[in-house]
């Protein structure tokens, strides 16, 4: 990904002015560039800009720095992806103004893919790290490793993902941020400051962030712990750390029509009158599971991701009801399946084997 190296002293001198250039999304102050094209190439800095109005279709005058050429770390573009305005604008502000952005919300709503698809359209390298309970401080910071040099085994320190990303033009995404271990979270706390330096005590090194380094996170909660019972393993987050996140946006379940449009964008075989009717009924079933969950009648909730999988599985099996049972119903508690089957019956007018009527008859 790196096209070349620039002397540390020169990089240090230019850091502040170049950071400002990236934040403004311009080539430099009036009267000349902060850096010429060769310098920008050496540091892997954005070399173009995109209009939010033209690229994403939202009414906004924001202009975001971007790269003209993608590299191997840029996510693949999904041309059918539908963006949520609030979430997308928050993410774009993170890229344009070096804000630390957290996207919270229920599972399956597209939190991580929103960040990836924004990065894909900016050609901005993006790396995701699943911050589960097994990710340790060593995994993030680095460790000593035995390597072979000149035919001899020697011990050499290898940077973890955090120092590596911190020194490159990478958008680092911490998935499942609220499931991270406390010792790991305190390592991250220092880099939450936009110009904070990362100190590696084992190496007596102080790392300055690359001007194009960006940090994002996704979480099912907002640091207050799991109040729904859906997300076992999540933890409360130190409020001093939460305070360092510049922007926190929520991406929860969308209105019916928007969710149906997302499903149709993915399940193209339903793009006809009959198919649209089926998708609307699928989303209606999902809406009923969410209402039942809110009312305390159901412990499992249907996410937009599940609806998309249901539509895809229905094409595989050629049967909407059978696909529903395999995609969602079998994930539910056995005692709650008659309730979920009733939701299906209300929407589609068909009884499933798990419906209350069939259970009573049997």
What are these regions (language model features)?
Residues 3, 21-25, 31-276, 284:
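AAA+ P-loop NTPase catalytic core and its hallmark functional loops
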Residues 89-97, 308-313, 325-330:
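Short, hydrophobic/amphipathic alpha-helical patches that form generic packing surfaces
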Residues 253-255, 260-325:
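Conserved AAA+ ATPase small/helical "lid" subdomain
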Residues 317-362:
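C-terminal engagement/docking regions of AAA+ P-loop ATPases
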């Amino acid at each position: 990904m790196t096209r070349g190296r620039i002397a540390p002293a020169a990089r240090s001198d230019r850091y502040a002015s170049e950071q400002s250039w990236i934040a403004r999304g311009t080539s430099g102050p009036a009267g000349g560039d902060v850096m010429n094209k060769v310098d920008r190439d050496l540091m892997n800095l954005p070399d173009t800009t995109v209009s939010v109005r033209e690229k994403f279709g939202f009414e906004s005058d924001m202009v975001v720095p971007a790269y003209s050429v993608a590299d191997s770390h840029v996510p693949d573009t999904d041309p059918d992806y539908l963006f949520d305005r609030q979430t997308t604008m928050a993410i774009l502000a993170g890229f344009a103004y070096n804000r630390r952005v957290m996207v919270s919300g229920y599972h399956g709503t597209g939190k991580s893919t929103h960040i990836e698809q924004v990065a894909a359209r900016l050609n901005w390298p993006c790396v995701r790290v699943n911050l589960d309970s097994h990710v340790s401080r060593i995994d993030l910071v680095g460790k000593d490793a035995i390597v072979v040099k000149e035919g001899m085994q020697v011990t050499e320190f290898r940077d973890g993902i955090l120092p590596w990303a911190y020194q490159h033009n990478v958008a680092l995404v911490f998935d499942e941020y609220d499931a991270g271990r406390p010792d790991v979270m305190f390592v991250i706390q220092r880099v939450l400051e936009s110009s904070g330096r990362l100190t590696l005590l084992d190496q007596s090194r102080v790392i300055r962030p690359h001007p194009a380094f960006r940090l994002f996170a996704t979480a099912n909660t907002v640091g207050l712990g799991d109040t729904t019972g859906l997300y076992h393993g999540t933890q409360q987050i130190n409020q001093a750390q939460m305070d360092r996140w510049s922007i926190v946006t929520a991406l929860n379940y969308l209105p019916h029509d928007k969710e149906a449009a997302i499903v149709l964008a993915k399940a193209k075989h339903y793009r006809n009158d009959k198919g649209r009717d089926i998708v609307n009924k699928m989303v209606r079933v999902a809406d009923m599971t969410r209402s039942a969950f809110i009312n305390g009648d159901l412990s499992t909730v249907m996410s937009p991701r599940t609806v998309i999988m249901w539509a895809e599985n229905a094409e595989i099996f050629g049967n909407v009801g059978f696909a529903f049972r395999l995609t969602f119903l079998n994930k539910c508690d056995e005692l709650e399946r008659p309730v979920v089957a009733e939701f299906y019956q209300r929407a589609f007018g068909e009884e499933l084997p798990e419906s209350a009527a069939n259970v009573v008859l049997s």
